[in-house]
């Protein structure tokens, strides 16, 4: 999706 939710951002941050 174009708009990434905070959950998505947090998920990516957690993955890294």
From Swiss-Prot:
<keyword id="KW-0456">Lyase</keyword>
<dbReference type="GO" id="GO:0009507">
    <property type="term" value="C:chloroplast"/>
</dbReference>
<keyword id="KW-0560">Oxidoreductase</keyword>
<comment type="function">
    <text>RuBisCO catalyzes two reactions: the carboxylation of D-ribulose 1,5-bisphosphate, the primary event in carbon dioxide fixation, as well as the oxidative fragmentation of the pentose substrate in the photorespiration process. Both reactions occur simultaneously and in competition at the same active site.</text>
</comment>
<dbReference type="GO" id="GO:0019253">
    <property type="term" value="P:reductive pentose-phosphate cycle"/>
</dbReference>
<keyword id="KW-0601">Photorespiration</keyword>
<comment type="subunit">
    <text>Heterohexadecamer of 8 large chains and 8 small chains.</text>
</comment>
<protein>
    <recommendedName>
        <fullName>Ribulose bisphosphate carboxylase large chain</fullName>
        <ecNumber>4.1.1.39</ecNumber>
    </recommendedName>
</protein>
<keyword id="KW-0503">Monooxygenase</keyword>
<feature type="modified residue" description="N6,N6,N6-trimethyllysine">
    <location>
        <position position="12"/>
    </location>
</feature>
<keyword id="KW-0934">Plastid</keyword>
<keyword id="KW-0488">Methylation</keyword>
<keyword id="KW-0120">Carbon dioxide fixation</keyword>
<keyword id="KW-0007">Acetylation</keyword>
<dbReference type="GO" id="GO:0009853">
    <property type="term" value="P:photorespiration"/>
</dbReference>
<keyword id="KW-0113">Calvin cycle</keyword>
<keyword id="KW-0602">Photosynthesis</keyword>
<dbReference type="GO" id="GO:0016984">
    <property type="term" value="F:ribulose-bisphosphate carboxylase activity"/>
</dbReference>
<feature type="modified residue" description="N-acetylproline">
    <location>
        <position position="1"/>
    </location>
</feature>
<dbReference type="GO" id="GO:0004497">
    <property type="term" value="F:monooxygenase activity"/>
</dbReference>
<comment type="similarity">
    <text>Belongs to the RuBisCO large chain family. Type I subfamily.</text>
</comment>
<keyword id="KW-0150">Chloroplast</keyword>
């Amino acid at each position: 999706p174009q708009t990434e939710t905070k959950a998505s951002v947090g998920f990516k941050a957690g993955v890294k």
